[in-house]
Amino acid sequence: PGGDISEPVSQATLRIVKVFWGLSSSLAYKRHFPAIDWLQSYSLYISRLQEWFSDNVSPEWNELRAKAMRVLQEEAELNEIVQLVGVDALSWKDRLTLEVARSIREDYLHQNAFDEVDTYTSLAKQFAMLRLILEYQEKGNQALDAGANLSDAVSYTHLRAHETLA
């Protein structure tokens, strides 16, 4: 059947190339391109590339990448809870995590190949964008620890409105 990668030829290929990009029909239906599932996909070259990214982009690159992956994994777990009992059952920190994950997905990972600006982004800009998104989470968590709630903060929809005006 389609999508079965457990058969011997696929397994041998995966051992040789050491990379797997799992395509997601649900992402494609949502018009999220490239429709690569970040939770199923992997590369065994990450350890080899860490030094290069640290030297050529930023020493923080690998840490930010790992944090972003944790946020996306946490989002998948939280979405299961949301489907069962609703978003109101989540703590403010969990809601913030969902907002940050949405920003990673929609603002960072999503591309429009037909848009001149979106077709290509330098590594320096990618780093700055990811750092900004994760800094939003850090500052948001600090505000929540200080007694604020997420509705007091600038919401993602307000950020979108400002982006449209800019």
Q: Model features per residue range: what roles?
A:
Residues 1-154:
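P-loop NTPase catalytic core
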Residues 157-164:
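Conserved small/polar residues in nucleotide/adenosyl-binding loops
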